[in-house]
A protein has these predicted regions:
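N-terminal helicase ATP-binding lobe
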Residues: 1-166
């Protein structure tokens, strides 16, 4: 994977491994090597299941060791504004985090398939602001087999577009 990450600048690749064999580490290693070798800007880790996302977020944070560079965007993230009593610092932190969530302006973005699809296909302004972040990015899609059959055509069109144009 290290060599593939260095040699391949773009494309769509499939990694099949049994559960528990290290797909998260392997795909992350490929992505990091590709980012370093080809001046990519971001790594997106996308999965359909919150439980998988939360589990792999912990693995990715432990592997990368600096969670300041990692943005988690899903429905189980609770804002510190909701739990912090210091209103002034809470408002500033909330605004900064909300900006990152609205823009996905972070080196590593961990999110759900729902957020990914909304960014690609919805016309809401926050989704449009995120879309350009895919340019020069590495997209890792975990559990892709969980996609409903009725979205596969559009999903494949978008993936082909993104792999050749972006």
């Amino acid at each position: 994977l290290r060599v593939a990450g260095i040699q391949n600048n773009y494309g769509i690749y499939k990694l099949e491994m049994p559960t528990g064999s290290g797909k998260t580490h392997a795909s992350l290693r490929y992505a990091i090597n590709n980012v370093c070798s080809h001046n990519k800007k971001r790594i997106f880790y996308i999965t359909a299941f919150l439980s998988v996302l939360e589990q792999n977020a912990a693995v990715i944070k432990k592997t990368l060791s600096d969670s300041d560079y990692i943005l988690e965007h899903h429905s189980n993230i609770i804002s510190e504004r909701d739990t912090n009593s210091d209103e002034e610092s809470s408002t500033l932190d909330y605004r900064q985090k909300q900006y990152l969530i609205d823009s996905w302006n972070s080196p590593v973005v961990l999110t759900t398939m729902v957020q990914f699809f909304q960014t690609m296909f919805k016309d809401k302004s926050s989704n449009i602001r995120r879309f350009h972040q895919f340019i020069d990015g590495i997209i890792i899609i975990d559990e892709v087999q969980s996609l409903p059959v009725n979205v596969l055509y559009h999903f494949n069109l978008m993936m082909n577009f993104m792999s050749t144009i972006m």
